[in-house]
From Swiss-Prot:
Its EC number is 1.2.7.1, 1.2.7.7. This is Pyruvate/ketoisovalerate oxidoreductases common subunit gamma. One of its GO terms (molecular function) is pyruvate synthase activity. Heterotetramer of one alpha, one beta, one delta and one gamma chain. The gene is porG.
């Protein structure tokens, strides 16, 4: 679950 780390960038936060 990476979305929990980048909370606020669209879910995944990888973008």
């Amino acid at each position: 679950m990476i979305e929990i780390r980048f909370h606020g960038r669209g879910g995944q936060g990888a973008v």
